[in-house]
Amino acid sequence: MSLDLALDIQHATTCDWLPTDEQFALWATTAIGNSMDEAELTIRIVDTRESQMLNSTYRGKDKPTNVLSFPFEAPPEIELPLLGDLVICAAVVENEAREQQKTLEAHWAHMVVHGCLHLLGYDHIEDEEAEEMESLETQLIEGLGFTDPYKEQ
């Protein structure tokens, strides 16, 4: 079974390097895997101002962040393939990649996989949940040809 993904990519900022639409689709499809037959996903690339505003509004943290996940929750009697939205701050991803000595491509892939797993219900608040999520992220990222995103550089 393969995933039928409808992907909407919104560019609300500019930056030095962005993944291609094909890369975004590959990373999202890999993360979603066989969880759904079809899915609709929006990835919005934003600046630090928009990221900070959303992070403050929805998480109470007054600073920009790398990725925010907004899952779509339909009423129980309605079945829709809407997975949700990812909001990724390009400047934060670039800074983190540089600080963590990762390639931009590898860190963008990690942010898309990480965000998609949140949309699927994974979380990292509790230690046990964090271990499960990080293990799955590592498996998916390594399957894409990148190194373990949690391994110390």
Curated annotation (Swiss-Prot):
Its cofactor is Zn(2+). One of its GO terms (cellular component) is cytoplasm. One of its GO terms (molecular function) is zinc ion binding. Binds 1 zinc ion. Keywords: Cytoplasm, Endonuclease, Hydrolase, Metal-binding, Nuclease, Ribosome biogenesis, rRNA processing, Zinc. GO terms for biological process: rRNA processing. Zn(2+) binds at H114, H118, H124. Its main location: cytoplasm. It is an enzyme of class 3 (hydrolase). It is found in: Cytoplasm. Its EC number is 3.1.-.-. It holds the Pfam family YbeY. Belongs to the endoribonuclease YbeY family. Single strand-specific metallo-endoribonuclease involved in late-stage 70S ribosome quality control and in maturation of the 3' terminus of the 16S rRNA. This is Endoribonuclease YbeY. It comes from Shewanella baltica (strain OS155 / ATCC BAA-1091).
